[in-house]
């Protein structure tokens, strides 16, 4: 690989460029019409203007692929956010002979859909949270709520969700309809899909994620864990690696479960498999998988002394 187009902006674009340059790879930046003075452009070897302004310019697959072909980029790194988990973007890159730095299209299709990800976990005998596990109507949601023991709480999630958007905690059945309406609207705006599913809301659990890495040929490994329980509005605020709350037994069980899920799809690149852990009841449940580089990857880099972005590029 001699040239890499970085399909992002800001901090993550700069982070990727640093690792690419360390590997002797030419870096190519992109920018929207209103990002002409953005800092990330000064860190690239070359830059190309995208048509349009704002966020929409960085979500235009056709335009970005066109630029990649024009500048003869050999690979594309999507960073995080924007098109990083879009299977269509991965497909178009590979179709045009450009390496996609990330998981394959088929993997993104599974992990980008929270229901499909839960189905995979169940298939691999990894426990999941009790829920509807399918696109759910208001009537089905009401039926599910009634099936739980008295005093239970429900959480609404977007099927295509991420980043805490499209999520609502419902403490009473009478609040269900209004919460569904709000969550559906938010999911539609954020992900282009209003589809929702429902789970029992588990309180007083630790949120633990296992960092995984795979080469796409059936070899996968783990890069230990991160504790991300401290959150506000479902957004992670503080991450600690390794988790100070995990017992050795639980750590081994979570790692084994994460690797089984990754092996099932011949995982390629970096990703995280996330769990809720209740150490009082000695149980854990799979929540979701993120098939991309995460903002908090630097926390893991600090404890291992590895450059995870370099690893991504080398695998690609």
Where does each model-flagged region fall?
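Alpha-helix N-cap recognition
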Residues: 137, 171-172
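ATP-dependent carboxylate activation and anion-phosphoryl transfer catalytic cores
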Residues: 2-27, 47-49, 69-71, 102, ...
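Acidic/histidine-enriched active-site and ligand-binding environments that engage anionic O-linkages
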Residues: 145-156
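ATP-binding N-terminal substructure of ATP-dependent carboxylate-amine bond-forming enzymes
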Residues: 1-124, 136-143
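Short, flexible turn/loop "capping" segments at secondary-structure junctions
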Residues: 41, 158-161, 235
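Conserved beta3 strand of the protein kinase N-lobe
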Residues: 131-132
């Amino acid at each position: 690989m001699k040239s890499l187009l970085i399909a992002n902006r800001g901090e993550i674009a700069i982070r990727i460029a640093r690792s690419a340059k360390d590997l002797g790879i030419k870096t190519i930046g992109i920018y929207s019409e209103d990002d002409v003075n953005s800092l990330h452009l000064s860190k690239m070897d070359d830059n190309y203007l995208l048509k349009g302004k704002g966020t929409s310019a960085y979500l235009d697959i056709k335009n970005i692929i066109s630029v990649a072909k024009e500048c003869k980029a050999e690979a594309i790194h999507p960073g995080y956010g924007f098109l990083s988990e879009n299977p269509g973007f991965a497909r178009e890159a590979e179709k045009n002979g450009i390496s996609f730095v990330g998981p394959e299209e088929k993997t993104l299709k599974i992990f980008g859909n929270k229901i499909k990800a839960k189905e995979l976990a169940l298939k691999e005998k990894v426990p999941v949270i009790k829920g509807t596990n399918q696109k759910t109507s208001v009537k089905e949601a009401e039926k599910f709520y009634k099936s739980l023991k008295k005093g239970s709480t429900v959480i609404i999630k977007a099927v295509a969700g991420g980043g805490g958007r499209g999520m609502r905690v419902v403490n009473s059945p009478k609040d269900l309809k209004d919460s569904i309406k709000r969550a559906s609207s938010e999911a539609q705006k954020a992900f282009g899909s209003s589809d929702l599913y429902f789970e029992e809301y588990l309180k007083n659990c630790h949120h633990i994620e296992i960092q995984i890495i795979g080469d796409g040929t059936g070899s996968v490994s783990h890069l230990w864990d991160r504790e991300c329980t401290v959150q506000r509005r479902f957004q992670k605020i503080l991450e600690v690696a390794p988790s100070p709350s995990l017992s050795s037994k639980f750590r081994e069980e979570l790692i084994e479960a994460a690797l089984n899920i990754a092996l099932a799809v011949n995982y390629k690149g970096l990703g995280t498999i996330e769990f809720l852990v209740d150490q009082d009841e000695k149980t854990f449940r799979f929540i979701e998988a993120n098939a991309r580089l995460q903002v908090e990857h630097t926390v893991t880099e600090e404890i291992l002394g590895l450059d995870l972005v370099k690893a991504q590029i080398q695998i690609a």
